[in-house]
Amino acid sequence: MAERNEQILTPSQLNALARDLLEGSFPLVWVEAELSSVTRPSSGHLYFTLKDARAQIRCAMFKPKSTWLKFQPREGLRVLARGRLTLYEARGDYQLVLDHMEEAGEGALRRAFDALRARLAAEGLFDAERKQSLPAHVQRLAVITSPSGAAVRDVLSVLARRFPLLEVDLLPSLVQGDSAAAQITSLLQRADASGRYDVILITRGGGSLEDLWAFNDERLARAIAAAQTPVVSAVGHETDFSLSDFVADVRAPTPSVAAELLVPDQRELVPRVRRAQARMTQLQQHALGNAMQRADRLALRLRAHSPQARLQLLHRRQEEAGRQLGARMTQVLERLQARVQRGHAQVQSHNPQRHLAGLQQRLRALHPQAAMQRRLQHDQLQLRSIARSLEAVNPLATVARGYAIVTRPADGSVVRSAAEVAAGERLRAQLADGSIEVRVEPGER
């Protein structure tokens, strides 16, 4: 047996290598051909052959993609298909797995679409940096679409269910045909210039590439890019892409999804609103409590500085001054009484009659007449001086100036304060030229 240095492979290893080689060597490819041997088993996948006059290739389109086909695949139909080359390893079958397929008449439109998309992308119209964010709370929405299509019904139904408070303006337009793109562009520019709307939605239902061609118009794409109002594009089904989708600020796969993106679900808002209300109530109560405390402090300050408080303070001061004055007058009267008593004692001790008797006795004892005369004059001068001193402290002199000394007739005690007497009590008032009996009348003390 000959010795072999080459690697020996099993069929599965060889098929795996061939699959890796195919998938790594070929990018996404477009093929235009005729359908043949079309089958759709219960799994929902689509199997068929693409052929021309000289060759054919097996193809598969799995259910998630085949569901969105806009036509019914049939024998002999010419199509334009997009997919990747691969190898089904179990049988070693070389095949094309498709993710998109359309009728072949759309091929020229597809090439024009790809060329325009590449040019606009190179200009930066699709860049994420230039796209605007949607406002958190949309209040006014402009919807540009056909007034009779399924898209507008889906959008309005979702909006009414999720957030019926939204203000929606329907701007009716053609959505396919030669004049559709110009009409959509005009409505978009007018809505944007009005400044009335928070968001502008451009939408329509599904269709073929030719049906959706108005949304691949270059003028419309540039108008969307220039709009100051955020623009949402929801054209066709999830697998459909238009230039308006690429250039819009937000692309929604379907009209219904676009409506869901634009407004919150009112059922989800209820607990949020309740939490906000509870928080607002808490803040209001806190603010009210602070305001009431501040009002109480201000009220205390106002009461402390009010005229009534000032009068009360003055009244208390007046009462205190009255008490002090009464006490002072009592002290003065007591001192005057003491001085009167001392003066009376001094008067008694310096009685002129007694002093004169002594002098006369001394004069009789003196024999020389001249000496007696001088002594007598000296004593008279001294007597006058003493009399003046006594007169200065004599309470009767104070009475002579208009004052009175009030005493009780029963015991002769001096009345020093109005608080010591009672209404109706009889008293004696000593005046300069005599005394009078008085009676206490009720009144202010």
UniProtKB/Swiss-Prot annotation:
Enzyme class, UniProt record, top EC level: hydrolase
Enzyme Commission number(s): 3.1.11.6
One annotated GO biological process: DNA catabolic process
Record protein name field: Exodeoxyribonuclease 7 large subunit
Organism: Xanthomonas oryzae pv. oryzae (strain MAFF 311018)
Underlying gene: xseA
Function of the molecule: Bidirectionally degrades single-stranded DNA into large acid-insoluble oligonucleotides, which are then degraded further into small acid-soluble oligonucleotides.
Places the protein is found: Cytoplasm
GO CC term (a single one): exodeoxyribonuclease VII complex
Catalysed transformations (reactions): Exonucleolytic cleavage in either 5'- to 3'- or 3'- to 5'-direction to yield nucleoside 5'-phosphates
Hydrolase among keywords: yes
